[in-house]
Amino acid sequence: MSKGALLAMTRSLAVDLGQHGITANAVSTGYTHTDITAHMLSVPEFAERVKNVTAMKRLGRPEDIASVVCFLASDEAEWITGQWIDATGGYKMPPPV
């Protein structure tokens, strides 16, 4: 599914479910150390290249993503819905002008 389609679906869910007090958001994770990315990130040159184009200059950890998801599931985020949360550590952000 493309990013645009996922955002459209997230916003549609937010509108449909909001009347029931249910929020819907999407989280973009970038390169995070998981079983799925292990084969790519085990190549030192690739991992370095990813770090070099990430503002935080490191790869993501599962707990980085978990904290965002836990926040979105908490009462503190009850007014956030229909959003695309970029939890990538600033992956491929354009340099400052």
Region roles according to the model:
Residues 23-33, 73, 86-88:
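Conserved SDR Rossmann-fold cofactor-binding beta-strand/turn motif
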Residues 2, 10:
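Active-site helix of classical SDR
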Residues 54-65, 76:
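A conserved structural motif in NAD(P)-dependent oxidoreductases
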Residues 39-54:
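A short C-terminal helix-loop "cap" of Rossmann-like NAD(P)-dependent dehydrogenase/epimerase domains
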